[in-house]
């Protein structure tokens, strides 16, 4: 007798998802703990192509504070998904420079940084990596902005005050 014939499909799917969650918790408990709950951000922004709830969800799943992500979006692009800065090098909502993040783009399947969802997914991944490396938002934001922990201190302070 096959297992599928004794267990209803919805129960089977639920069991698989639960086991997947347990495996995630064992492999990487920090990720599981961070995605157990949804952080609702205080900052609400009007961005075409992506909802506040979607930004909150992407940020939370990436293990970063949605308020910080939205503050970056406001600071970097003013919420314009078509923003281009730094002489054409920084693109989209979170003003990401693809020349520095090509490998991460490929890993995540990011095709267009002008796509608001893809831009936020990559921006959150970058910020999460930096937070993991430096252990605090001040240094992570400074490096996100300037490439080092010193030159972007004023930027980090502005983001954290929003």
Language-model features, listed with the residues they occupy:
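Sec-dependent signal peptide cleavage junction
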Residues: 19-34
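Catalytic glycan-binding domains that act on GlcNAc-containing polysaccharides
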Residues: 31-32, 37-162
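Selective for proline/serine-rich intrinsically disordered segments
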Residues: 6-7, 27, 114
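Sec-dependent N-terminal signal peptides of Gram-positive bacterial secreted proteins and lipoproteins
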Residues: 1-23
């Amino acid at each position: 007798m096959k297992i599928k014939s004794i267990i209803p499909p919805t129960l089977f799917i639920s069991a698989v998802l639960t086991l997947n969650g347990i495996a995630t918790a064992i492999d990487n408990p920090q990720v599981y703990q961070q995605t157990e709950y949804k952080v609702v951000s205080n900052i609400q922004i009007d961005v075409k192509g992506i909802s506040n709830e979607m930004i909150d969800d992407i940020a939370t799943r990436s293990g970063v504070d949605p308020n910080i992500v939205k503050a970056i979006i406001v600071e970097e692009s003013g919420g314009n998904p078509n923003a281009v800065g730094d002489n054409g090098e920084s693109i989209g909502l979170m003003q990401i420079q693809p020349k520095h993040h090509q490998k991460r783009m490929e890993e995540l399947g990011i095709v267009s940084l002008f796509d608001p969802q893809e831009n936020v997914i990559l921006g959150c991944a970058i910020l999460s990596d930096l937070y993991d490396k430096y252990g605090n938002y001040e240094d992570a934001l400074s490096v996100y902005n300037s490439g080092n922990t010193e030159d972007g201190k004023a930027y980090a302070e502005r983001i954290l005050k929003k």
